[in-house]
Amino acid sequence: LSKLPGEIVSANAYMGVEGILKALDMGADVVITGRVADPAIFMAPAIHAFGWSLEDWDKLGKGTMMGHLLECGGQVTGGYFAEPGKKDVPGLGHLGFPIAEIAEDGSFFLTKVPEAGGMVTVETCSEQIVYEIHDPENYLTPDVVANFKQVSFTELEKDKVKVEGAAGKPKTETFKCSIGYKDCFIGDGEISYGGTGCVARGKLALEILRERLELVAPGVFDELKFDLIGCNSLYWSSDCQYNQEPSEVRVRVAGRAKTRTEADIIGNEVEALYTNGPAGGCGAVKHTRDIVSVASILVSRYDVKPEAELFTV
């Protein structure tokens, strides 16, 4: 922690089911938590309802599998899945969230209400299972080390998928803890160019901005990024990869600086392109924001004591 470049402003340990169980045991109808691992939100009610032991690792592995599939809501009912003509999803404008029906032995299936949009299929479940898990045989959570290696999906009927094969191993002695610290300021500016020659005018705008920032703020920015949105903002190629020139592009420049005043320079220079840059610039915007960055450490689980308080409203 002493090596972090800025002032620490937050520390949030990823807790498990313990605090949620305390709240449920107190009779809570709604539980509001601090930072907990996503699967714990869904697994805790199952533990509470069925009286599972917190050392029944296979049941906890199954519960974690359920929570992992549910944690991002509409992602398992077709959100973040659709690709027209290849993976079509009906009703994304009224996408339904998933429902898990779980039995005491930890077996469960996923579904959704029939009138809601989206779909629950083997394919949507298969994409969600690999989301953010790193090693499927050792998915580390505060409550269990889950093993998803043998998980299988079976479509029982339309929008109803059975999930089997999850297991678990004893939990680790540590919690992940996210440390927030004051890092820098980021300034950015954008301006659009459209019509014939828009790519050439966008490139000229970027050349002007490079020259201006070197002139008015030499050595100020720790990092600078120059994008021509519509050509190279996602893949960082040096040129537009089109057989035909696009009808519009958007120039974007962003940079990291140590002070807000320095970061403001970028947006001001982009805005100046209205009158001092290529023809036809429009829609300029600028922003400056202070950045709280995140570093991750491990802390002893025994140093973190969840508490619960019951309110009646």
Question: For the regions a protein language model found, what residue spans apply to each?
Answer:
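C-terminal non-catalytic interaction/assembly regions of soluble proteins
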Residues: 164-313
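Short glycine-/acidic-enriched loop or helix-start segments at secondary-structure transitions
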Residues: 41-44, 81
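A glycine- and small-aliphatic-rich helix-loop capping segment at beta-alpha/alpha-beta transitions
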Residues: 45-56
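A conserved active-site cap/scaffold subdomain adjacent to cofactor or substrate pockets
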Residues: 60-170, 186
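Gly/Ser/Thr-rich loops at beta-strand to alpha-helix junctions
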Residues: 35-41, 258-260
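Conserved active-site and cofactor/substrate-binding residues in soluble primary-metabolism enzymes
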Residues: 15-19, 26, 60-64, 120, ...
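Structural signal for hydrophobic packing residues in well-ordered secondary-structure cores
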Residues: 24, 28, 54, 69-77, ...
